[in-house]
Design a protein with these regions (language model features):
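Short, low-complexity, Lys/Arg-enriched N-terminal segments of secretory-pathway carbohydrate enzymes
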Residues: 1-74
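Glycosyltransferase catalytic domains, chiefly GT-A lineage
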Residues: 45-600
């Protein structure tokens, strides 16, 4: 059989089997994670034990000989051995073809690709990924990467079988993919891409959704389509759905359960709240999508999010969560990351992050996620993210290592080797500085910004500015993590002045926690912030159950006109909520014979 070694699929298989980067030596031989307290106390003292950090060195373009010796120990693992057998079979037919086929041109290429796809499907079928396999997420990333490559030519024999084996929780994946990409390709040629907002919504967040949509429609004067996803009749009652779709133009509701896209036995989404979010992203027909939590408050129009340079370059716009360290949890997270990235190493973006350098256990805040589904890599990564939120996987791995759905978005891109973009700054704070506590800037509202102009380079990573570096060096010299009180910072010092100059360049984007001061306690007391802040480190105070920011850069509310904007948002949100309460009290939207409580 004649096989073209330059075939794209052949090259992709070779890269997938051995990886483009030098591999870290495997330290553990167990096949599953030990989440016991004993494991949580594990520490990594020597550089050889350290799973990641500044001492990690990555070879950008290792030679084949270096690749062989650095991957040898990885190939001893079960998943590595399976890939090795697959690679050897592939090379056997490359180097020693059994017979020639009298075909030429595209026919020869199609024959080669079909043969390798058959081998790959057999590998996926014979080696299903278990929820707690030590390197299961890494293997799933490899399979997702291959899937994205094959999306360019889905007419290959066995492709749909591979698709079904890879995404068994979506029985109609072939129909979903065909309908979506036919529309997306047509849209790219004949009409503008379709933009929309997607939100997973339950009855407990009805008030927040009212305020969110009121702000979009009345404050920003945006008519961007909005889809509200729920799961089952009890999740979002009919009278609430009726009000949302009649009061606001261009708003629709979608029952994911009735939609029938997903296998409930595998996804187990009933009464799961945030786990619905990646499935809503998969289900929507929008091309460019903003996924939003109901309690997110936009400080810029939704259209501005889609215009960010990082989004245009990569098809993704991600925001960081709080920069917070917790030793017990860090051991589990670092073990997971090392196990699943030891074969390839981190991407350039991840290698530079505070998360990788063990300065925090949170990386992404999923209150706002912006993606371009017309890109095949983005589409494939969203399927991988949804897989991480299926019932057994989230219960046995994802939600035991991380905190809900948050990390499943960027992690899908990272493990599949796809490009993605994060705003540079980790979450800051907005609120009343020193209102009741001297521990720092305590706030229930993480604050997010757009990058300052000029901080994005061509590959989507961030160019570290001299001002940020100067602030970091000054803070490091002044105090260790969380050891210096913010009151001791001299506002006239060079470091503080440089930090404030840098902060003026960013633009407020959004914050978490709704317009309420404490949403879990009162539905009537609205925020009245006196300052906003970026940078610094977060600390959780166990006794008072408060999140407080230390060593931050504080800015007045007058900066960027944020004080005026917040007051206008509160006014718009309260008017929208008042209309809703009035309609509900009159019973205008109650189904016949139904009684319900008026939302507080």
């Amino acid at each position: 059989m004649h096989v073209d070694p330059a075939s794209p699929l052949t090259l992709k298989m070779r890269t997938a089997a051995f990886g483009p980067r030098e591999r870290l030596p495997a330290r553990h031989g167990d096949e599953s994670f030990d989440l016991s307290p004993k494991h949580q106390r594990q520490s990594f003292e020597s550089p050889m034990q350290r799973p990641w950090g500044p001492n990690y060195k990555q070879s950008v373009a290792p030679s084949p000989r270096v690749l062989w010796f650095t991957t040898r120990r990885f190939l001893l693992s079960l998943d590595g051995l399976a890939l090795a057998v697959f690679a050897l079979l592939a090379w056997r037919y490359l180097l020693f073809p059994s017979r020639d086929i009298d075909v030429s041109g595209m026919q020869a290429k199609a024959s080669t690709d079909s043969y390798f796809l058959d081998l790959w499907v057999k590998h996926v079928t014979d080696h299903p990924i278990r929820a707690r396999d030590r390197t299961g997420f890494s293997e799933m990333g490899l399979r997702t990467s291959m899937y994205a490559h094959l999306l360019a030519d889905p007419s290959l024999p066995d492709f749909e079988e591979y698709e079904r084996k890879l995404w068994p929780f979506i029985p109609g994946i072939a129909s979903l993919r065909k309908s979506y990409f036919e529309g997306a390709r047509y849209a790219s040629e004949k009409r503008p891409k379709t933009r929309g907002i997607v939100m997973s919504l339950g009855k407990n967040d009805f008030d927040f959704a009212i305020q969110y949509i009121s702000i979009i429609r009345d404050h920003y004067r945006s008519n961007i389509p909005i889809e509200l996803y729920y799961y089952g009749e009890d999740d979002l009652p009919p009278h609430m759905r009726h009000y949302l779709t009649t009061e606001f133009p261009n708003v629709s509701t979608v029952d994911l359960e009735a939609l029938g896209f997903f296998d409930e036995n595998l996804t187990q989404l009933k009464r799961q709240g945030f786990a619905l979010k990646p499935f809503a992203l998969v289900a929507t027909n929008f091309t460019e999508v903003m996924l939003a939590d109901a309690d997110a408050v936009l400080l810029a129009s939704p259209e501005e999010f889609f215009e960010q340079k990082g989004f245009k370059e990569t098809g993704t716009l991600f925001f960081h969560d709080r920069d917070h360290v917790r030793a017990g949890a860090a051991a589990i997270i670092h073990e997971f990351m090392n196990s699943n990235l030891e074969a390839r190493g981190p991407s350039e973006r991840l290698a530079k992050s505070a998360f990788w350098q063990r300065k925090g256990i949170y990386e992404q805040e999923s209150g706002i996620v912006v993606v371009d589904k017309s890109r095949m890599e983005v589409f494939a990564a969203l399927l991988f993210s949804a897989w991480q939120n299926t019932g057994e996987v989230r219960r046995r791995t994802t939600y035991r290592i991380f905190w809900g759905d948050k990390e499943t978005f960027w992690l899908a891109f990272e493990l599949a080797g796809f490009q993605y973009f994060f705003v540079k700054h980790y979450a800051g704070a907005i609120g009343r500085e020193h209102a009741a506590h001297a521990e720092g800037f305590c706030s229930e509202h993480p604050f997010h910004v757009f990058d300052a102009p000029g901080t994005i380079i061509s590959d989507g990573s961030h160019a570290a500015s001299n001002l940020t570096q100067a602030k970091a060096e000054a803070e490091a010299a002044a105090s260790a993590l969380l050891m210096a009180d913010v009151e001791n910072q001299d506002p006239k010092s060079t470091a503080v002045q440089l930090a404030r100059k840098e902060a003026r360049k960013v633009k407020p984007a959004w914050f978490n926690g709704s317009l309420l001061e404490l949403k879990k306690i009162s539905r009537e007391l609205y925020i009245s912030p006196t300052a906003w802040a970026i940078d610094g480190q977060w600390e959780f105070l166990e006794d008072s159950e408060l999140w407080c920011l230390r060593n931050y850069t504080a800015m007045p509310m007058s900066e960027h006109g944020l004080d005026r904007n917040i007051q206008q948002l509160i006014s718009t949100g309260t008017r929208g909520l008042a209309r809703s309460n009035a309609a509900m009290s009159r019973g205008e939207f109650a189904p016949r014979g139904e009684e319900f409580d008026i939302p507080a």
